[in-house]
């Protein structure tokens, strides 16, 4: 099933493969596998798929706050997300920014965040995505 890895805009066409990773228990924020499916995320997407896709290309920021690991909520930054695809979902890369400055808030680790699912690592996908 493998084809050359490319970046694709998140869309319904690729959603089943993305959801398959969640069902498999892959935490797509930390890119670790867990013992159980990530049912909260699956349910959120199922409840409002339009909202899910809107958040992947959020040029203005705002919208619902982002819940941090410590339970606090922070402002959603403008961001663009691309999925890594080689015939199936293999990861994602996200670009974040604040308007009118190069600075990011202290809770944001950088302008670029990316990850590759565990079974697709060591193929150069992250390097190619960058």
Where are these regions (language model features)?
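Conserved acetyl-CoA-binding loop-helix of GNAT-fold acetyltransferases
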Residues: 113-116, 122-130
């Amino acid at each position: 099933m493998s084809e050359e890895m490319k970046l694709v805009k998140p869309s319904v066409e690729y959603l089943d493969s993305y959801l398959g990773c969640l069902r498999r228990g892959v935490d797509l924020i930390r890119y670790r596998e867990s013992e159980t499916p990530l049912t909260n995320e699956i349910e959120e997407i199922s409840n409002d798929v339009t909202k899910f896709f809107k958040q992947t290309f959020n040029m203005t920021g705002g919208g619902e706050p982002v819940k941090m690991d410590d339970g606090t909520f922070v402002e959603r930054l403008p961001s663009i997300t691309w999925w890594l695809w080689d015939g199936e979902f293999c990861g994602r890369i996200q670009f974040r920014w604040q308007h009118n400055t190069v600075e990011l808030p202290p809770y944001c680790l950088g302008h670029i965040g990316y990850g590759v699912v565990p079974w697709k690592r060591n193929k150069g996908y992250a390097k190619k995505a960058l």
